């Protein structure tokens, strides 16, 4: 009211104004657990096994890339899928993380419908899943940043039917062998293995 003065009183539709409240911050995904409930240890990056997930879309109708990044080591996983249907994305995530199942504690998603099968993912991997607030990409900033690096290999608008699994593997390998300043210029893949063996 302070910003709009008394003008809101003259609005039609029953004198109602839009207010961004709790309902606008709630995930549309069924049984979604909010990022607000995520353990503090995930933010601190003290342990191995907390992941962020996303999808990168190709040119319309040509498929998607499922991406996962581990928060402590920055290990980055990519898989090409035919579509971003929830069942397809569910299967991809389970396949990607099963080799690292001992290092999967949590997975944080955005509110895309492709992650609607999160309960099945939890069951398969023995992990807890959390959802960022809508329109809050910074809450998964690591994944967003890693996807930006992936775009150097697979630019936005690429027809993913023309991208081979080998292309994806090479991009993933480059990202995991790229020294990171935040890791003391060490490589994500080596950092991941160091912590994995020490556990």
Range-by-range predicted roles:
Residues 57-61, 78-101:
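Active-site beta-loop-alpha junctions of metal-dependent nucleic acid enzymes
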Residues 64-65:
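Short loop/turn microsegments at loop-to-beta-strand junctions
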Residues 102-117, 135:
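Acidic/histidine-rich, metal-coordinating catalytic segments
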Residues 48-58:
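Two-metal-ion RNase H-like nuclease active-site motif
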Residues 73-77, 99-105, 153-154:
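Short, surface-exposed connector motifs at secondary-structure boundaries
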Residues 1-43:
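Basic, flexible linker segments flanking DNA-binding modules
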Residues 98, 119-199:
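Charged alpha-helix within mobile-element recombinases
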